[in-house]
């Protein structure tokens, strides 16, 4: 019985941390774009940081044999509805939306799911946050669930048909977070791909 219990525990642990399988499809959403610049810090625009990271994540996933879908691959505006339609129509297995946060003061990285998210959404978000933490963050602000009826129940999480999360990759308004983002961009992309 003890042997069976240990074997079962090992199987459960392996399943929780199993990497994405070759042949699966991940939809990568670079937030904002075109006239929608997102948050800013001087001449630094969130839309540009999101796209740089999205392209790096795409390359890392492809190197692992994982199919990718980009909601945008250049500086164009794509509506939230069209982002979700792309992921749903192409039957992505996972959806991750990449963003930068902003505030008068504040730093750190956080990942959002829906309030009362299905276990797969939470697992995806927790695995990504753990992997990013291993690279290094100014502050781990954790995995957060949106509150029904408010803006933090992000449209893309609500309207995609697969496990999804929205990652806020540091505060664009914080110089320390920007330095980490620039220094670790490739490592963050690899961490997301491995999560």
Please annotate each region the language model reported.
Residues 1, 13-17, 21-24, 48-195:
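Active-site-proximal helix/loop segments of hydrolytic enzymes
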Residues 1-8:
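Sec-dependent N-terminal signal peptides
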Residues 20-42, 96:
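Catalytic-core environment of secreted peptidases
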């Amino acid at each position: 019985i003890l042997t069976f219990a240990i074997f079962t525990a090992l199987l459960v642990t392996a399943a929780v941390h199993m990497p994405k399988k070759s042949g699966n499809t991940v939809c990568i959403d670079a937030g904002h774009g075109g006239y929608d610049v997102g948050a800013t810090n001087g001449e630094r625009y969130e839309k540009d940081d999101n796209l740089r990271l999205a392209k790096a994540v795409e390359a890392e996933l492809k190197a692992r044999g994982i199919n990718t879908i980009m909601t945008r691959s250049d500086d164009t505006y794509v509506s939230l509805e069209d982002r979700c339609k792309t992921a749903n129509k192409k039957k992505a297995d996972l959806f991750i939306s990449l963003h930068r946060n902003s505030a008068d003061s504040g730093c750190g990285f956080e990942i959002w799911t829906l309030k009362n998210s299905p276990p797969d959404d939470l697992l995806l978000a927790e695995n990504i946050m753990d992997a990013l933490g291993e690279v290094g963050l100014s502050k781990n602000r954790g995995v957060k669930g949106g509150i029904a009826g408010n803006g933090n129940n992000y449209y893309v999480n609500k309207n995609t048909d697969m496990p999804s999360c929205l990652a806020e990759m540091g505060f664009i308004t914080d110089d320390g977070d920007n330095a980490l983002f620039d220094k670790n961009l490739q490592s963050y992309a690899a961490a997301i791909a491995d999560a």
